[in-house]
Regions:
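Viral RNA-dependent RNA polymerase
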Residues: 1-346
């Protein structure tokens, strides 16, 4: 071992950093390219997980600080997205038209084999009332010296399957309704081309000068608290889950209900079971990194919050072609945007 590097015949490994350097060393990665500074990768151990909870969750959380007027705008926009007569991405008709075409083997992650899906479904079918079991771990990644490790919270295979039908519907409906406001389904190069073409500023607008914003959420998962998710995304999850339960007689209602119930909880019970260490923790509910819906729900959160923060009538922008609206200062403003997770381009 040379500092944070260990040399073996098969290659050069990266030693995981721990609070106690006297114990057995963990190899947490490999070097494939020359480096100028030794990497700081936190080891997979309980002390690092506890540090991640304290530094990354407890200290970074922010309460929802919207006013009553903000809350009303959010509720109005979300209600319009579900029950509106026009431009509602999650209307009952759109959900039902999509649901009857879905088969688990076809909507599973491309990384999953059919055997893995079948085993997860069979395991769930052996239980009367299956529930989510959240597992935590330390994310193995190089970090700046002063930064604490990041915590991963996984729903595991059972949770992925129970959430799959609901989340796949939401994800697909967002892609269909806002095809040019995201980058899913394309290579990076093609996605950027599509976004830049869609966000091209008309000459008439450009004459008045245009401001471009690039947004990158700070501690995004941690600040997606139960209170803001209850306003923005839980109504959509509950609406789609009810449709799934009403149509998919072959899928136990308990699956969609367990998923919707977990998303509404204010506390999360997580367990850490790695390298013969075991501990249970209860944390304030945040966005789970291993949730099947992390990507599309982050997109929806980003889209709704930006429009509600800027405009008096944000629900008008549920029409993908709508560009003008009166902002909170009373100015008639032109806006176009695209999103990916916690990143935004306006």
């Amino acid at each position: 071992v040379e500092g944070r590097i260990i040399r073996k015949e098969c290659g050069i490994g990266v030693v995981g950093q721990t609070a106690d350097d006297t114990g057995r060393k963990q190899v947490c990665g490999v070097l494939s390219q020359p480096i100028s500074v030794e990497p700081n990768v936190y080891a997979q151990e309980l002390n690092n997980a506890v540090m991640a909870i304290e530094e990354r969750i407890n200290k970074k959380q922010r309460p929802y600080a919207g006013s009553a007027a903000d809350e009303l705008k959010i509720k109005r926009m979300v209600h319009q997205a579900i029950h509106g007569k026009r431009n509602s991405p999650f209307s009952a008709k759109k959900v039902m038209d999509l649901i009857h075409t879905l088969v688990y083997e076809e909507i599973k992650s491309k990384k999953w084999t059919e055997t893995r899906v079948s085993e997860a479904i069979e395991s769930l079918c052996r239980e009367i009332d299956p529930q989510f079991k959240l597992k935590s771990s330390v994310k193995l990644e190089p970090m700046p010296e002063e930064k604490a490790p990041r915590l991963l919270i996984a729903d595991e295979d059972r949770g992925q399957v129970m959430a799959l039908m609901t989340i796949y519907c939401i994800e697909t409906l967002i892609k269909k309704h806002f095809p040019e406001k995201g980058i899913k389904g394309l290579s990076k190069k093609d996605a950027i081309k599509r976004v830049m073409k869609a966000c091209r500023v008309p000459r008439k607008v450009a004459k008045k000068l245009v401001t471009v914003f690039e947004g990158d959420g700070s501690a995004w998962d941690t600040t997606c608290s139960a209170s803001i998710r209850e306003l923005v995304e839980n109504p959509v999850i509950n609406h789609v889950a009810n449709m799934v339960n009403g149509f998919m007689y072959a899928t136990p209602e308990t699956w969609a209900d367990a998923h919707a119930s977990l998303c509404a909880q204010e506390k999360l019970d997580i367990s850490y079971t790695k390298n013969k260490e075991y501990q249970k923790e209860t944390i304030n509910a945040i966005r789970r990194s291993g949730h099947r819906g992390t990507s599309c729900l982050n997109w929806w959160m980003n889209f709704v919050c930006w429009h509600c923060a800027i405009f008096e009538d944000p629900e008008l922008f549920l029409d993908p072609t709508h560009r003008y609206g009166k902002d909170v200062t009373g100015t008639n403003r032109w806006m176009n945007s695209a999103y990916e997770g916690d990143d935004s381009f306006l």
